[in-house]
C-alpha cells in the first residue's frame, strides 16, 4: 500500500454551505469543496474573523496524517484533499467540531478541530491493483475531495481503486456496505458533489484501469478520440460552428504527445480511460450510474478541482484540450451545462479561439466556472489557461452559435504559455453589504497588458488574485476590473468570509517540459552534461526549485493585505484549496500535515 506525506493548514474562521443537502442559511460548516454545491468559496456564516481581527491569526495546532510519500505522487497531486468541517458530531468523547481530510494513501482522517487530535482514521485497502506504474500525471491515488451528508451523518469518499465508501462521521464505521465501484480504478477524479441524493464527479487525464463501461468507440479514421469534420447540414454546421478541430493534445495540462510513460505496471498498459462525467443515484438501492463521455479517449477531460458545479438547476463543467465536434460527441475546450442525474447536454459554450487553445495546450478546463443571480439575471463566469475571463448568460451560454460570450476580458497570459500562466484554479464569488456582486480568479503570471485594474497592490509578476465587480453597462452585465493583489507565487483558488479574501502563494515549481527555456536556465549546471531538450520533466525535477506556502488574508474590496503567515509553513503545495469553517482556515500541503490557525489573544 502506498503511503503519502502532506501538510494541511488550518486557520480559524467560520464556514457556510448554503445549498448542500439539508444545509442552508448562515451555517458555519464546510461540507463540500468550495463550501457549497455551487462552489462559490463563500463562507456566509463567519463572524469570528473580520477585517478588524484577522491580523491576529496565530498557529494553534498541526497534525500529520501520513509519514511517507512517493515523489511521483507529491509532484503531481494534492497530498491531502481540501478539509471538510462538520459541527456537533456526536463522537464517543462527546459533541465536537470535526475536520475531515483524505490523503493520497487512501487514509481518511477525522481530527478534533479544537486540538488537532485524531478522533479516528481509516486506511482503505485496494480491491484491485493498478495496471500502470504511477507517475506525476497518473498517480494511482485518491484525488477527489469527499462530501458530507450531514442529515445522514455520513461522509462519502472515493478510494483509489474506484470504490465509493460511506462512513459514519462520528466513528468512521462503514455505512455503505459493500462499497460499490463508482469510477474506473485509479482514474483521476475531482471533488465529489452531492445533490438530492445523487453523487457526481469527473474522470479525466486518461488514467486508470480502462476501458470504461459504455465508452464510445473512436470514429473511423481518427486518432486519440479525434473527429472528422462535420458533414454539411449537421448540428454543428447549422449552428454556425467551425469544422471539428484536429490535432488535439493527448492529455490535459501538457503538450500533445509528451506525457510521461505510463510504465509496465502488472502487464500491458490498459487503454486510456475515456474522459467523462459520472453520477450515482444513492437513493436507489441498486445505485444506478449515468455517464456522459466528452471523448473516446484521453482528450477533453475535466480537471478543475471543483468538479461539477451546481447552478440554475443544472451542472456546469469545463473541458480541456481536444477535438470539438458535438455531433460526434467530442467536446474539447467547452463549458457544458448538464442536466442533473442524467447528465444530458442542455447547453454549451466553446471559445471562438478554439484553434489557438488547442495549438498551444491552453486548457479551458484548467480554471473553473460558477453561476449566480445578479439583478434578476442568471449569469455564469469562467476562465482557463489562456487568461480570458468570460461572463455568460446562463439561459444561452454562447448565443445562437454557442461561440459568442455576453462579455469577455483578457486578464492574463499574453504569452499564451501552456504552463506558469493563466487561471489554474476555481473562481469564487460573494455579495457585500451594499449588495454588490464580486468575482475573484487566481491568475498565474502577470496581468495582461490589455486589462487595467483600478487598484494594484504591488508587482504581481508570478501571479495574483484578480477581483472583478459585476455591473450593468448599457443594459448589459459586464465585469469591471477592480483590483489585483500582491505577488503570489503562485495563487490557488481563493475563499471569502466576512469581507476577507483568503489566498495562498503555493511555492510550487510550475515548469513542466524540457523544451522550456527556463528549464535550462535554472537546471543546467556549469560543466555538467547537457540537459535533455525534449520530453516532460521528471517528478524529481518538478520537486526541486520550490519555496514554501504562505497564507494571506486580503480586504475583499481593495486587495489590501491584512495578514501573512510568512514563514510558518515550511513546505509547498500543489492543487490545494483553502477551507474556511467555524472560526478556522485550513490549507493542505504535500507533507500531509494539517495546520490550524485562529485568533490569538
Regions found by a protein language model. Give the residues of each.
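N-terminal secretory signal peptides that target proteins for export/translocation
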Residues: 1-2
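Bacterial N-terminal signal peptides
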Residues: 5-15
Amino acid at each position: 500500500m502506498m503511503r503519502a506525506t502532506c501538510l494541511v493548514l488550518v486557520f480559524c474562521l467560520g464556514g457556510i454551505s448554503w445549498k448542500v443537502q439539508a444545509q442552508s442559511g448562515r451555517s458555519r460548516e464546510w461540507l463540500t469543496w468550495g463550501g457549497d454545491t455551487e462552489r462559490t468559496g463563500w463562507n456566509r456564516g463567519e463572524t469570528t474573523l473580520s477585517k478588524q481581527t484577522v491580523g491576529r491569526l496565530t498557529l494553534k495546532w498541526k497534525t500529520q496524517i501520513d509519514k511517507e510519500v512517493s515523489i511521483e505522487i507529491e509532484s503531481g497531486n494534492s497530498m491531502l484533499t481540501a478539509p471538510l468541517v462538520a459541527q456537533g458530531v456526536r463522537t464517543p468523547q462527546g459533541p465536537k467540531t470535526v475536520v475531515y481530510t483524505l490523503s493520497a494513501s487512501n487514509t481518511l482522517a477525522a481530527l478534533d478541530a479544537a486540538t488537532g487530535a485524531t478522533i479516528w482514521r481509516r486506511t482503505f485497502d485496494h480491491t484491485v491493483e493498478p495496471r500502470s506504474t504511477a507517475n506525476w500525471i497518473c498517480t494511482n491515488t485518491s484525488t477527489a475531495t469527499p462530501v458530507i451528508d450531514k442529515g445522514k451523518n455520513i461522509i462519502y469518499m472515493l478510494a483509489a481503486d474506484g470504490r465509493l465508501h460511506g462512513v459514519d462521521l462520528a466513528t468512521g464505521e462503514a455505512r455503505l456496505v459493500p462499497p460499490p465501484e463508482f469510477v474506473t480504478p485509479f482514474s483521476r477524479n475531482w471533488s465529489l458533489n452531492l445533490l438530492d441524493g445523487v453523487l457526481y464527479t469527473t474522470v479525466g487525464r486518461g488514467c486508470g484501469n480502462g476501458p470504461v463501461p459504455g465508452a464510445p468507440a473512436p470514429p473511423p479514421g481518427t486518432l486519440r478520440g479525434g473527429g472528422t469534420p462535420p458533414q454539411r447540414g449537421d448540428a454543428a454546421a447549422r449552428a454556425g460552428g467551425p469544422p471539428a478541430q484536429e490535432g488535439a493534445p493527448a492529455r490535459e495540462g501538457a503538450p500533445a504527445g509528451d506525457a510521461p510513460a505510463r510504465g509496465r505496471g502488472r502487464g500491458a498498459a490498459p487503454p486510456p480511460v475515456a474522459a467523462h462525467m459520472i453520477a450515482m443515484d444513492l437513493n436507489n438501492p441498486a445505485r444506478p450510474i449515468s455517464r456522459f463521455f466528452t471523448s473516446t479517449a484521453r482528450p477533453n477531460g475535466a480537471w478543475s478541482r471543483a468538479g461539477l458545479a451546481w447552478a440554475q438547476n443544472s451542472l456546469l463543467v469545463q473541458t480541456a484540450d481536444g477535438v470539438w465536434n458535438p455531433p460526434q460527441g467530442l467536446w474539447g475546450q467547452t463549458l457544458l451545462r448538464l442536466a442533473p442525474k442524467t447528465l444530458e447536454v442542455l447547453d454549451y459554450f466553446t471559445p471562438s479561439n478554439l484553434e489557438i487553445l488547442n495549438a498551444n495546450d491552453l486548457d479551458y478546463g484548467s480554471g473553473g466556472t460558477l453561476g449566480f443571480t445578479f439583478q434578476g439575471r442568471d449569469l455564469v463566469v469562467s476562465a482557463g489557461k489562456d487568461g480570458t475571463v468570460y461572463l455568460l448568460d446562463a439561459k444561452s451560454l454562447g448565443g445562437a452559435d454557442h461561440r459568442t460570450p455576453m462579455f469577455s476580458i483578457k486578464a492574463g497570459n499574453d504569452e499564451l504559455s501552456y504552463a506558469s500562466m493563466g487561471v489554474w484554479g476555481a473562481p469564487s464569488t460573494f455579495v457585500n453589504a451594499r449588495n454588490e456582486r464580486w468575482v475573484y480568479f487566481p491568475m498565474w503570471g502577470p496581468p495582461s497588458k490589455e486589462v487595467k485594474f483600478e487598484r494594484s497592490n504591488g508587482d504581481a509578476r508570478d501571479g495574483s488574485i484578480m477581483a472583478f465587480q459585476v455591473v450593468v453597462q448599457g443594459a448589459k452585465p459586464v465585469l469591471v476590473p477592480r483590483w489585483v493583489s500582491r505577488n503570489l507565487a503562485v495563487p490557488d483558488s481563493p475563499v471569502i468570509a466576512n469581507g476577507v479574501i483568503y489566498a495562498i502563494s503555493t511555492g510550487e515549481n510550475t515548469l513542466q517540459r524540457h523544451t522550456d527555456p527556463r528549464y535550462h536556465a535554472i537546471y543546467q549546471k556549469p560543466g555538467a552534461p547537457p540537459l535533455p531538450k525534449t520530453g516532460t520533466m521528471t517528478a524529481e525535477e518538478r520537486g526541486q526549485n520550490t519555496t514554501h506556502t504562505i497564507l494571506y488574508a486580503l480586504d475583499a474590496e481593495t486587495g489590501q493585505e491584512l495578514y501573512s503567515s510568512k514563514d510558518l509553513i515550511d513546505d509547498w503545495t500543489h492543487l490545494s484549496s483553502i477551507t474556511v469553517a467555524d472560526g478556522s482556515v485550513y490549507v493542505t500541503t504535500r507533507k500531509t500535515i494539517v495546520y490550524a490557525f485562529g485568533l490569538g489573544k
